[in-house]
Amino acid sequence: MPTIVKTPSGTWKAVIRKTGFPTTSKTFRLKRDAEDWARSTEDEMVRGMYVKRSQAEKMLFSDAMDRYLREVTIHKRPYTQQGEKPRAATLKAHFGAYALAGITSELVAKYRDDRLAGVHRKDAKGNPQPLQPNTVRLELALLGHLFTVAIKEWGVGLVYNPVLNIRRPSPGAGRNRRLSAQEEQRLMQLIDQYSNPMLRWIVRIAVETGMRSSEITSLKVDQVDLARRVVMLKHTKNTMPRTVPLSLKASALFQEAVDNPLRPKRETHLVFFGEPGKDGKRRPYNFNKAWLEIKAKAGMSDLHFHDLRHEAVSRFVEAGLSDQEVSTISGHKSMQMLKRYTHLRAEDLVAKLDRLSDAT
């Protein structure tokens, strides 16, 4: 039987001692609440459903997320780490003051709906700015994995993962942003005028090769084989290493970058390097601020850097490369992922059918 005792401060403490379970207790303001808790907890023990929730009730989400970043995110690929940190900051801003046990499926569902509706994200005029479904989906994926790790590895007593019980937004259709000839000319003119030539090399290499920004900026000199005109990528988004062939333009750009007289050879082997950090180490060149400035000047605020990869792959298809050849260059893991480019194949077929008609 549970023991209910009155404490010197006037509250009521329920203590449960049961064979096969650790002694557990909880303090309440009212005796009735202590009795109700003791009765339901003992019932859970009898039915084999008892979960000790004390840690889940004490651990704040902000502390849990900090621990996740230290113990879990740190072991993920740099590309993933880069994406998770801002998502973690967003989740902490919303759930940070909650205990893990206080985050329910209803609360997570409201977060999902508010993010999709742009409730907490306004433009200069105060109008809601809805987020893309895939952005919210990735935030929920991080939130859900934190709860999974907390339950399975940290021993946090939670009955269920609140994210598993809600609907996730679908990724939606992939972006289909292409550069017009006028846009490309305007963009490249501004890129070429920028003070740091590394921005020019990075942007033009992206258009020529279809490489991701993280793949380009993390390159080391020994990964660039200009004699064979290839770049060897060891760490990619889909974990599969690949060798990227270089066009003549891409080779010339890499030659300039590798021969950069400002690159401190003794300090870094990075092709695209930033200023030394507080620890004296040089990390990959962070061009995000410069890229945003250039886009604004060019009047192309809707252009994402990743759209340059889409542009490059589209050009590969238009040039007549097979899906297998395109996949080898771009690193798309399956042919299914290249289906968004099938309309380009269809346009080629129309031209071929026209030529066939002219010949008959």
Task: Give residue spans per PLM region.
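N-terminal DNA-binding module of tyrosine recombinases/phage integrases
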Residues: 6-110, 114, 265-267
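Basic, Lys/Arg- and aromatic-enriched nucleic-acid-binding interface segment
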Residues: 10, 121-133, 137-142, 152, ...
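Short beta-strand motif preference
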Residues: 12-17, 231-233, 244-246
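Well-ordered beta-strand positions in beta-sheet-rich domains
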Residues: 24-27, 176, 230, 241-245
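Short, amphipathic alpha-helical segments that act as regulatory/interfacial helices
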Residues: 38, 42, 85-92, 140-151, ...
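C-terminal catalytic core of tyrosine-transesterase DNA break-rejoin enzymes
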Residues: 134, 152, 204, 208-215, ...
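Catalytic-site neighborhood detector that most strongly recognizes the C-terminal catalytic loop/helix
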Residues: 178, 235-239, 323, 330-355
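Active-site/catalytic core of tyrosine-dependent DNA strand-transfer enzymes
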Residues: 182, 228, 247-301
